[in-house]
């Protein structure tokens, strides 16, 4: 197992006691690997697509903890030999998740998936939780005994800037 995998596994074992921090970490997992999709019947679904077992595990733990979703309500679909899709199809749960992430309001007239809503990462502890979730979903780190390199890969430049700002907030030199 690589050093980066060991670090991710160690970080994923941590479960914040504060719900707001759990939500921030979940928001990072969704921001990095999640999406909203429509079923063939037109119903909304929340989905995380990843080959990362640690991120998959953390996503499920947070779903169960934050939203009290039973594991029997989670749909697992193998997309390829490596990728697994985790979907929530229950419309009440989907609505609850979207509202918690601030991706929609009570009317559901406008749904806007954003990397992270600023209200979710107002507190320092929530910023740390978000960074942890982003690292678990899309980060890597080299063994500091060899050389130091830490990165989190973002799909969009504005997401990378947002994450960079959070890292700089803690005086970490992010580029």
Language-model-detected regions and their locations in the chain:
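A broadly used, surface-exposed interaction patch
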Residues: 56-126
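Compact structured core domains
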Residues: 173-175
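Intein-associated homing endonuclease modules of the LAGLIDADG/DOD-type, together
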Residues: 1-60, 66, 114-166, 170
